[in-house]
Amino acid sequence: MKFYNSTNEIPEEMLKGIDLTYPQLTYLPETGILYDNTYNEKTVPIISGGGSGHEPAHVGYVGSGMLAAAVTGPLFIPPKSKNILKAIRQVNSGKGVFVIIKNFEADLKEFNEAIKEARTEGIDVRYIVSHDDISVNAYNFHKRHRGVAGTILLHKILGAFAKEGGSIDEIEQLALSLSPEIYTLGVALAPVHFPHQKTSFVLAEDEVSFGIGIHGEPGYRVEKFEGSERIAIELVNKLKAEINWQKKANKNYILLVNGLGSTTLMELYSFQYDVMRLLELEGLSVKFCKVGNLMTSCDMSGISLTLCSVKDPKWLDYLNVPTGAFAW
């Protein structure tokens, strides 16, 4: 059982609860739109969103120095384009609006429709598609390139740059430089559980699935669980191969250790310790690390690991700029 009245009502009730908790945030009922009512109209607003079930993403990242607004849809279903359009209109002050979209077919459809309509209204809307997931399809081994936990780095770095006064053109260029440097891979010990619904995959108590998705999608391989260190080795090696860091002159990295819902902080920090030791052996220096439930998959028991090469030292400054977002 879960502490809500029904799966249909929970996103709306959650957003109303957030509105009641944080005076600086305003929820527009029946729209999924939560916006920062202290937003500085002299800066370019950044918005994002997607289906609910990934909390604190994206509503937890609304606030000064991050998102001006987030649009939330039903559980694992993106918001409708009409509500995304309303969010764009809500925060537009004539300087353009920048949108961060996770790379899922349904999300792209709804966001692209909204952006197209906003542009016909004369709003300068730019966007980036987050595609940090390096998992592969188990049937054809094609890269999935889904937008997952690494998306949060776009929220924070772009948001801080916008707060500093970056123009819409400059924000777009920063996004295009930053996004290709972000890589993520996830693993699960147990799938998402919704009352009265079947899980999307099944694992025995002693099994682990590599490459799972944030909507409960199964991974590319299942094997016996052999401890946190074994999982850390798998994820670090896969990220290493993708990033090809032996050929990179820069050895400075940003690290995110993300819980997928029901993974405890004790587990997350234990896993982080394993990862940090491996990265040290590889000669890499972690200049910024964040651990916690950053982008979840409801109550999935799992972890994702994100690495981002510090191509520009200013990215670290932007990560450390204070923000009003309650989940950072």
UniProtKB/Swiss-Prot annotation:
UniProt xrefs under Pfam families: Dak1
GO cellular component: cytosol
Keywords: Transcription, Transcription regulation
UniProt keyword Transcription, yes or no: yes
InterPro entries from the UniProt entry: DhaK_1b, DhaK_dom, Dihydroxyacetone_Kinase
Key word Transcription regulation present: yes
PROSITE patterns for the chain: DHAK
Tele-(1,2,3-trihydroxypropan-2-yl)histidine PTM positions: 215
GO molecular function, one term: glycerone kinase activity
Domain DhaK: 6-328
Any single GO BP term: glycerol catabolic process
Function text: Coactivator for the transcription factor DhaS. The heterotetramer formed by DhaQ and DhaS functions as a transcriptional regulator. Activated by covalent binding of dihydroxyacetone to DhaQ. The complex activates the dhaKLM operon.
Subunit structure: Homodimer. Interacts with a homodimer of DhaS.
Protein name: DhaKLM operon coactivator DhaQ
Gene responsible for this protein: dhaQ
